[in-house]
Amino acid sequence: MDKQQSPPPRRRRRPMLSCWECRRRKIKCDRNDPCAHCIRHETQCVFTAHTGTVATDSDVSRTRPGPKSASRPGVSIASGSNSAVATRPSSDAGRGGSAIPTAPPPRGPSSLPSIAGPNHPFNILNPSQDVSAPSTQVLQPSSRGPSLSTNTSPSASSAVIHTLLERIKTLEDSYSSLSSRHGDSIESRVSSIGEPRDLRPAWEDTVARHANAARRPAGLAGNWQDIVRRKSTKLGRSHRMGDAPDFAAIIECYSVMMGLTSKDDFSHIPEIKDLLAEGGGLLVESKQIAQRLKLGQPSKPPHTLSVVPPSPKLGQYLVRPTRERADVMAKLYFESFESAYRILHAPTFWANYEKYWQAPEAASNAVYLQILLVVAIGSSIYDHGDCNAVLDNIEMSRPCIFAAENWLADPFEKDRLEIAGLQVYCLCNMARQIYNVGGDLIWTSMGPLLYRALQVGLHREPGRLPGVSMFQAEIRRRLWATILDMVVQASLDALMPPMMSLDEFDVEPPANINDEEMDEDTTIIVPHPRTTFTSTSAQLALLETLPLRFGIVQYLFGMQSEQSYPSVLSLSSRLASALSMCNSLGNLGPQSQDQSHDNNMGTTNTTMAFRSITPFQRNLLDYLVRRFMTPLHMFFATQSHSNPVFHYSLTVSLDAALALVSPATPTTTTISTPAHNNEETNHFDRLLSTAGGLFREGFRTALTTISLALLVHAKTQQVSGTLHRAPQHRESLKAAVRDLVALAERRVRNGDTNIRAYMFLNMVLAQVEAMEAGARAGDGAFEMALVSGAVKSLRFCRDVIKTRAETRAPVDWEEMDFDADGMASFLPGDMDADAFGLDWDWESLLTTMDMAEG
């Protein structure tokens, strides 16, 4: 290079981290891509590189501040000093998030310039530069983040290039040696890891995505890197449905009410601004009321529960049900939940049940807790009459769950590792979801349950284990199948892959027999043909679909980087066939003879031998399988408005969502009376009206899916000019949304503090009705209808929970009685995370959280 050449122009010493527009306006830039100011003013967000050239977010790797740790992905350390150069490659997946740079594949020196183009601002391999100069240290760290030094002499630049070329060659050699041993597993795993979550509010991501939806490049939005980036705080699955641009107006209205964006950005009409301010006040007031309601719900049981349960100390904490109440509730449990999840052996339970009422002090901890949990679970579907009675039942049942959790948490008692202890664990997890005691965080409790099951050898075929009787072998097979299904259900809700693979156990399916056909003295078990319905038929049908559902969860939340539509269609077709198989249980023939069981309980019928499947059992089985359909299609269903190819996914998701919240009516195959069939259907309705966990997830998935289908259909008709010509399908969707509004109202009255579901559904109806009246976004009438629907809903929900807070006073901890050990009958502890949630943002409606912590 000519030494007489004039020196290059001087560059800025400090890297220009703000975007060009913020520097021009002399305002603070949040350094996001795009930044909030550019989003608000609808201007292109452009960042200027150090060389003075202008690069947009689609073709430049931006330099950003990062952690001081040298092990951060994307940071290259220069040898011999503490200096470093760190670049953060831009994401080609839209504005959903950036991915950590993947390890480069092995290649020769001739392919090295492909790392960056010749005109790239950060191109360190410019062919016009000499690479033969000796290595010289010219890189200096920056207190605000890694940046290039101001030393730009030709010899220094050549030294930088030579040094980096040598280091790249060393890294490629190391990568080649690893790839030769592990194949392409390293590259595939690294490429699927997303960028660590930015330390900024979650609502900012949502508002930015929807405000810039019109400027997104064509193609699929919301890529896998974005899902991984947000997984650490988004504990539910249905938030991906919230990425649909059809919800942009509703989310913007909610953001303004929460004070996240300016009212002027939404509307300049004073009346609308006043309603927005009122809505924000109602949201805050409702949150405060919900916090007061939770004061009477301790998150941990008393220390005195370490004693034998029937002791007088425990009586201060647990309200033991009456014999008459316990008989009814336990019978309801065995007729409903025990069909799909075989946890208990009915004759054994009823024998222990009778012994307990004869001598309560002689009952073991496990038996006592089993009875309490069975009664609590059964009472969840009982007709209590009114909302106050439902709330009373919830307050009576939750202490039983706390008692079981405390007993299971003792790490020094080996009886927790017995079959009875595992049965208590399964019942406790089921009750937690039904009564919403940390039901949205049940995945974290499935790990200990699975590990305990592995420790006692439930994953091994009991026929190959020495000393295991036929009776115990059958109980172990049933319990293992139940635990596996609980694991896959919890994984679906937590956006997590299954905790184990299907090739890590060799347990055979349970036998198709009734409980009354085996006991401790049984030496030979002759199963019924699969065409005969027994008390195990529902679990066997559920178990047949387990490999498919495991595969769906692994496909959705595994480490692969992308989803292909043909694979989704294939899994969807197989899942539809599995649902058809489950529904065929209603056509199974009855047994040759009634296997009724007499357990000295008078007229109480406690048999588990059903002649045909009941409506509740059919609905529960269908629910546990069908709920996998919507998340499978969810990613593509959100794209159906812009890409008609994916309209099938929206249709399938809509059908599944409607089925989840619409229990099947009794059929002619059941032999019970019509009144009994109707009561069975009402049982499942009551479960959806009160339960949390996987049942609340189904409700949330249904409301987002059905609402999306309604908005997409209405907007399509508005564009095509058929909004007033073909209203039949739109009216049916509106009727479905109104049914969801009624269900959301029942949930609020029955103790749920999530008022945003009710508000969201009414806002959807208000938006569609405004479109039918000819209103369009920006004309004032559209915004007025949206805000009015939201405020009206918030007023109603505020009044409901306020009345509940006034009539159900919280516990006065200062007046609690203390026992001889100085411990209160129960301690307040921390609020359970299920009470308020992790984020007070709009996406908490679309995930598993319902309120934010104060």
From Swiss-Prot:
Ranges annotated as DNA-binding: 19-45
Biotechnology (record note): Xenovulene A is a natural product exhibiting little structural resemblance with classical benzodiazepines yet is able to displace high-affinity ligand binding to the benzodiazepine site of the gamma-aminobutyrate A (GABAA) receptor and could be potentially used as an anti-depressant with reduced addictive properties.
Residue ranges, compositional bias (Polar residues): 78-90, 125-145
GO molecular-function terms, A-Z: DNA-binding transcription activator activity, RNA polymerase II-specific; RNA polymerase II cis-regulatory region sequence-specific DNA binding; zinc ion binding
Lineage: Eukaryota, Fungi, Dikarya, Ascomycota, Pezizomycotina
InterPro entries the record matches: Fungal_TF_Env_Response, Transcription_factor_dom_fun, Zn2-C6_fun-type_DNA-bd_sf, Zn2Cys6_DnaBD
GO cellular component terms listed in the entry, alphabetical order: nucleus
Induction (record text): Expression is significantly up-regulated under xenovulene A producing condition.
Gene this chain is encoded by: asR3
SMART domains in alphabetical order: GAL4
Protein name: Transcription factor asR3
Summary of the function given for this chain in its UniProt record: Transcription factor; part of the gene cluster that mediates the biosynthesis of xenovulene A, an unusual meroterpenoid that has potent inhibitory effects on the human gamma-aminobutyrate A (GABAA) benzodiazepine receptor.
Biased composition (Low complexity): 146-156
